[in-house]
């Protein structure tokens, strides 16, 4: 067996949405590229709700597509519902949004990346940047492999020193049941970079078999055929599925208020500021205390999945 020499033009660390686009773009522009991921079965994993686009975000996906990116194509191929938001306004305000099959989304990304010339994929964890003469020239991995590169792109998402909060319980991790990555943050600090911690949250998922859909309002997808990509004509491959609408009530709010003392957002555990337009359910009932209900969307996670995502109900409250 010939010794494998790890010399690349570009190494991309992390195979989420940004990393996949960066690696794909670099390879297609002719650079010998390596994409490093902790888990090759989680490439392009949709960490929160299995949806792409929406107001403002949908325009960004189309801009990525116009510049030759792959996200729009992957989304179209994995869509289980497509809707144009803001239809009551003029066309300039319309925003495309797609519900995706979480498993299919990963599979479509893998198909694209594994058939892209100049692109290799390596499963490992980067723990250190190799720097010589003030210049990044490679990475060192948890397995002890050193890889050379002319440039390194960090697209680490939530994994650098990631910390998960379940009420007062704290667990190191980048996502549920996935480990954090240590070493890079500490090295960046030593090199003089300022680092900070960002916060995001996600709701518990619910089992489809436990839902009484007769009590919910069905939200169908659009019947006219829209898509994200201008570059690829895709016929819907998957069964189109409905989302469902419901609301919290005062009884829900009372239960949530009783647990606020155990919420990391309100007991001092979490100091970071969360995303502006995606507040947790705790934040909603505190900030908008005058509201007697909040809208929730139950979204399917895939054609063959029993999991439903509760959009509008992200929380760091304990499981109780």
Where are these regions (language model features)?
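Amphipathic alpha-helical blocks
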Residues: 268-280
């Amino acid at each position: 067996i010939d010794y494998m020499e790890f010399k690349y033009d570009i190494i991309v660390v992390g195979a989420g949405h940004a990393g996949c686009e960066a690696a794909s773009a670099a390879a297609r522009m002719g650079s010998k590229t390596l994409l490093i991921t902790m888990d090759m079965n989680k490439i392009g994993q949709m960490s929160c709700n299995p949806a792409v686009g929406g107001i403002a975000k949908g325009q960004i996906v189309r801009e990525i597509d116009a510049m030759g990116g792959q996200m729009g194509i992957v989304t179209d191929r994995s869509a289980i519902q497509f809707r144009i938001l803001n239809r009551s306004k003029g066309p300039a305000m319309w925003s495309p949004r797609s519900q995706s099959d979480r498993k299919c989304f990963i599979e479509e990304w893998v198909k694209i990346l594994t058939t892209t010339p100049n692109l290799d994929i390596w499963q490992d964890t980067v723990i250190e940047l190799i720097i010589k003469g003030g210049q990044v020239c490679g990475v060192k991995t948890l397995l002890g492999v050193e890889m050379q590169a002319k440039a390194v792109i960090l697209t680490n998402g939530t994994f650098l020193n990631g910390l998960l909060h379940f009420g007062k319980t704290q667990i190191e991790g980048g996502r549920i049941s996935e480990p954090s990555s240590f070493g890079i943050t500490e090295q960046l600090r030593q090199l003089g970079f300022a680092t900070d911690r960002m916060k995001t949250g996600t709701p518990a998922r619910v089992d489809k078999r436990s839902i009484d859909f007769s009590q919910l309002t069905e939200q169908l997808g659009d019947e006219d055929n829209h898509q994200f990509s201008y570059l690829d004509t895709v016929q819907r491959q998957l069964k189109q599925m409905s989302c469902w609408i419901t609301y919290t009530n005062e009884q829900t709010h009372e239960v949530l208020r009783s647990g606020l003392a155990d919420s990391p957002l309100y007991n001092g555990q979490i100091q970071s500021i969360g995303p502006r337009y995606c507040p947790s359910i705790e934040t909603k009932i505190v900030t908008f205390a005058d509201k007697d209900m909040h809208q929730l969307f139950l979204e399917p996670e895939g054609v063959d999945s029993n999991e439903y995502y509760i959009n509008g109900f992200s929380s760091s409250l304990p499981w109780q």
